[in-house]
Amino acid sequence: AESIGKQGQEQTGKPTFTPGNPAVPMNDDTPATFEDGKTTKTVDGVGTYTVEPDGTVTFKPVPSFVGEAPSVTVVREDMNGTKVSAKYTPTVTPVRPTGEEVTSEDIQGKTQTGKPTFTEGDPVVPMDDSVPATFEDGSTTKTIPGEGTYTVAPDGTVTFVPEKSFTGKGTGVTVVRVDKNGTKASAKYTPTVIPVTPTADPAESTGVQGQEQTGKPTFNPGNPEVPMDDSVPAT
């Protein structure tokens, strides 16, 4: 018998046993076993097989396993006690979550956020919200000199605090999350910082010969959210 199931999900199969003669039927009072006489078999890195008295095998794969699993041999006997065996082979198809990149844009000096979208590969294997998101190196904070600092929250939201002098497209970071099987998905977040450039209007003054004069140029912020810094003296 064979069966196919999704990654991380139980599957079952039941080999068919046929009497050698109708006069000597299979003995339903004698439980089926594996060839070693046991009813449970665990294969490291693959999963656990359990056989029911009627010969039905349940296979529970470990969350990370995909592909064709090793076969197990099921043994039954007829009313004469004559044994017969048949193999059961399960196959596990991969379930792969995906990530969709995200961008953000704001003015120079302002904090930005972005949250990549992660989608489960199959509804039966949702994203694991109990496992915090990280960057691809396993960290949750990344500082890029001359650019700024990125921090990722457990839900995958990235906060970018740019250095005051930085403008343009940021390097970005890769966010990693996992599904309930522990399968990873990644997606990039990239911020863009729009320059804010203040302007100045010249000033003029007129006075009589030998007398002191004053004038004050007008300085205008490039954006109302980034006012002129009155704590820094003019030079």
Predicted segments — roles?
Residues A1-D28, S71, M79-D129, G172, ...:
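Extracellular interdomain linkers/hinges and stalk-like, low-complexity segments
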Residues K14, T33-D36, P53-D54, K115-T117, ...:
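Polar/charged alpha-helical tracts
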Residues N27-K41, G45, M127-E147, S231-T235:
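A surface/secretory-pathway sequence property marking extracellular, secreted
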Residues T39-A86, T140-A187:
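Acidic, turn/loop-rich segments in luminal/extracellular domains of secretory-pathway
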